[in-house]
């Protein structure tokens, strides 16, 4: 099993090129199922989840070719299979996005329920409710969600029970080929939804309102090919800005968009950091200062993103002062805190709130990653801790951060990936 070995502490400074956003690349790759002509995507990050998505597409009969400079060529004109199988879906919850484009274009589709996810637990039920309102018949059989419709889906007014990025994307994709007009109310507003809508419109869809809480989709009969550049990853950007803030460094993130990160930049400035913005870059200069503690409350976009919560937990455990972090989006998203406590952090969890008491130094330790964002916070903790930190289960990081050790090494990190023997 692969692990990271980090020898801290050190200052992280320099320039980093930001990759394409995983959270835009995945739905856009699945949305390419809707196209009857070839599609070319650029700025597609080289990640485990992208690799899994490509495997699912190929299983359906889509021709997918990787090209230079993170380009992907997709031809979905000869799809001959309508089932996304368990052996691929089990590793990635985002696989549910295959269902809506399949049923919209081919009037049928089957997707294995993502591993450990029953209908009603996560918002998989909202994806299904949206398709049902558009006329699909949904059955659950032997662990597979099966969707069928006679003829085309029908446009509908769909009011989301709660703000859900995944369900908003599913309904938006399905509605592009539906008969009539669909409105999504209480829609998620994330930049990745906007990027997916731009991609679909390039293929001939008629979508307005993406980025607001009401999206309108006028159905069309077919979608064609296009070229599209994936939006930069705002979460990767925020992660590297935090890396500079906690290590006393100065980092410039190139090829990114500040207007997708307003809530994060505001909190970094509140923490005492100097943040300068251009059209395509963000620079954070810590001025060699220890950050001030900042209170965080995660919210749907444009509020503070849940995917930056773990990184700001780390910032707060080494900040000057005491802070509260309230997680309103996901349950069980404080699993990094016990690991940070092993490194000398002082924090306690009360329900959906963590209270952090800043300490001046962390100590290296053996820690275990539990999910994608928690894992990167542990790696960054190792960068500022005294001594050696070993981070286990780093496959989580490879799901969402492209070339992470290379990028950190260029900023001054002493980090290496190594293979450890499997231990019972």
Swiss-Prot record:
Pathway: Cell wall biogenesis; peptidoglycan biosynthesis
Compartments reported by the entry: Cytoplasm
Active site: residue positions: 117 (proton donor)
InterPro entries the UniProt entry points to: Enolpyruvate_Tfrase_dom (IPR001986), Enolpyruvate_Tfrase_sf (IPR036968), MurA_subfamily (IPR050068), RNA3'P_cycl/enolpyr_Trfase_a/b (IPR013792), UDP_GlcNAc_COvinyl_MurA (IPR005750)
Entries under Pfam families matching the protein: EPSP_synthase
Enzyme superclass (EC): transferase
EC number: 2.5.1.7
Keyword annotations: Cell cycle, Cell division, Cell shape, Cell wall biogenesis/degradation, Cytoplasm, Peptidoglycan synthesis, Pyruvate, Transferase
2-(S-cysteinyl)pyruvic acid O-phosphothioketal sites (modified residues): 117
Residues annotated as binding phosphoenolpyruvate: 22-23
Reactions the enzyme catalyzes: phosphoenolpyruvate + UDP-N-acetyl-alpha-D-glucosamine = UDP-N-acetyl-3-O-(1-carboxyvinyl)-alpha-D-glucosamine + phosphate
UniProt-listed SUPFAM superfamilies: EPT/RTPC-like
Residues the record lists as binding UDP-N-acetyl-alpha-D-glucosamine: 93, 162-165, 307, 329
GO biological process: cell division; cell wall organization; peptidoglycan biosynthetic process; regulation of cell shape; UDP-N-acetylgalactosamine biosynthetic process
Record-level Gene Ontology MF annotations: UDP-N-acetylglucosamine 1-carboxyvinyltransferase activity
GO cellular-component term (any): cytoplasm
Family to which the UniProt record says this protein belongs: Belongs to the EPSP synthase family. MurA subfamily.
Stored HAMAP family: MurA
UniProt function note: Cell wall formation. Adds enolpyruvyl to UDP-N-acetylglucosamine.
Protein name (Swiss-Prot/TrEMBL): UDP-N-acetylglucosamine 1-carboxyvinyltransferase
Species of provenance: Glaesserella parasuis serovar 5 (strain SH0165)
Origin organism lineage: Bacteria, Pseudomonadati, Pseudomonadota, Gammaproteobacteria, Pasteurellales
């Amino acid at each position: 099993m692969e692990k990271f070995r980090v020898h801290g502490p050190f200052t992280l400074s320099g320039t980093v090129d930001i990759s394409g956003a995983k959270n835009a690349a995945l739905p856009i790759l699945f949305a390419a199922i809707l196209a009857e002509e070839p599609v070319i995507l650029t700025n597609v990050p080289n990640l485990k989840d992208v690799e899994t998505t490509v495997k699912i597409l190929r299983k359906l009969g889509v021709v997918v070719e990787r090209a230079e400079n993170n380009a992907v060529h997709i031809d979905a004109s000869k799809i001959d299979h309508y089932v996304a199988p368990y052996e691929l879906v089990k590793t990635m919850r985002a696989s549910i996005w295959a269902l809506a484009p399949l049923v919209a274009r081919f009037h049928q589709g089957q997707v294995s329920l993502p591993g450990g996810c029953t209908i009603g637990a996560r918002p998989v039920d909202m994806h299904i409710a949206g398709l049902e309102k558009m006329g699909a018949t949904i059955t659950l059989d032997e662990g597979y969600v099966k969707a069928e419709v006679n003829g085309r889906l029908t446009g509908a007014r769909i009011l989301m029970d709660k703000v859900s990025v995944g369900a908003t994307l599913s309904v938006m994709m399905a509605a592009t080929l539906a008969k009539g007009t669909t409105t999504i109310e209480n829609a998620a507003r994330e930049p990745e939804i906007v990027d997916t809508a731009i991609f679909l419109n390039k293929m001939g869809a008629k979508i307005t309102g993406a980025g607001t809480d009401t999206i309108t989709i006028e159905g069309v009969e077919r979608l064609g090919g296009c070229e599209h550049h994936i939006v930069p990853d705002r979460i990767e950007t925020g992660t590297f800005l935090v890396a500079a803030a906690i290590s006393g460094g100065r980092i410039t993130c190139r090829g990114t968009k500040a207007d997708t990160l307003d809530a994060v930049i505001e909190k970094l400035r509140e923490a005492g950091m100097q943040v300068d913005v251009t059209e395509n870059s963000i620079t954070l200069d810590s001025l060699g200062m220890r950050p001030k503690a900042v209170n965080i409350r995660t919210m749907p976009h444009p509020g503070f993103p849940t995917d930056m919560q773990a990184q700001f937990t780390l910032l707060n455990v080494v900040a000057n002062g005491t802070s509260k972090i309230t997680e309103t989006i996901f349950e069980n998203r404080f699993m990094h805190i016990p690991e940070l406590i092993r490194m000398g952090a002082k924090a306690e969890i009360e329900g959906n709130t963590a209270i952090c008491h800043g300490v001046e130094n962390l100590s290296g330790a053996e820690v275990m990653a539990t999910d994608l964002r928690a894992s990167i916070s542990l790696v960054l903790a190792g960068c500022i801790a005294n001594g050696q930190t070993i981070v286990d289960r780093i496959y989580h990081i490879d799901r969402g951060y492209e070339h992470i050790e290379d990028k950190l090494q260029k900023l001054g990190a002493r980090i290496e990936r190594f293979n450890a023997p499997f231990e019972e």
